[in-house]
Amino acid sequence: MSIKSRIRTIPHYPREGIMFRDITTLLKDPVGLRITIDEIAERYRAEKIDKVVGIESRGFIFAAPVAYALGAGFVPIRKQGKLPAETISCDYQLEYGYDKIEIHADAIDKDDRVLMIDDLIATGGTMEAAIKLVQEMGGKIIECCFVIDLPGVGGSTRLRQQDHPLYSLCSFDD
């Protein structure tokens, strides 16, 4: 059984016309979860990753165990106001307005080899902002990894056009 087949699709959620990709069915399946983490970790095992960055909130689910498997540190990127120490931030565009993400100012060291992980790429706006934060701190991004790509929304194309390497475990074209 593939990773993709373990992800539930919920039509018209959270609003009409949206096909929501629900990872909870993947997460509750111990084999599916293990396969997902192992596949990501194996891809980067030889890359000498220093830090694995997880994007709030579902990116944390995958990034922390991958960091553990690689012997790397885990770094959360969170929405504004959620991190307790000094932060740096970046605005990014939403469908209707803007939001802000933050990272602790001491989370990434210059020349750290960084793997970025999120559960899904749609527009690419959140990951684009996260990339800016890591690069501003002097981190070297090895790749941006997603469990799910929604290529029809355009985020993966957008990041590739900016020369950001990315990888996804599965994609949904509809």
UniProtKB/Swiss-Prot annotation:
One of its GO terms (molecular function) is adenine phosphoribosyltransferase activity. Its main location: cytoplasm. GO terms for biological process: adenine salvage; AMP salvage; purine ribonucleoside salvage. The keyword tRNA-binding does not apply. It catalyses: AMP + diphosphate = 5-phospho-alpha-D-ribose 1-diphosphate + adenine. Disulfide bonds: none annotated. The keyword Transferase applies. PROSITE patterns: PUR_PYR_PR_TRANSFER. One of its GO terms (cellular component) is cytoplasm. It is found in: Cytoplasm. Keywords: Cytoplasm, Glycosyltransferase, Purine salvage, Transferase. Its EC number is 2.4.2.7. InterPro entries: Ade_phspho_trans, Adenine_PRTase, PRibTrfase_dom, PRTase-like. Pathway: Purine metabolism; AMP biosynthesis via salvage pathway; AMP from adenine: step 1/1. Belongs to the purine/pyrimidine phosphoribosyltransferase family. PANTHER family: ADENINE PHOSPHORIBOSYLTRANSFERASE (PTHR11776), PHOSPHORIBOSYLTRANSFERASE DOMAIN-CONTAINING PROTEIN (PTHR11776:SF7). Catalyzes a salvage reaction resulting in the formation of AMP, that is energically less costly than de novo synthesis. Homodimer. This is Adenine phosphoribosyltransferase. It comes from Nitrosomonas eutropha (strain DSM 101675 / C91 / Nm57). The lineage of its organism: Bacteria, Pseudomonadati, Pseudomonadota, Betaproteobacteria, Nitrosomonadales. The gene is apt.
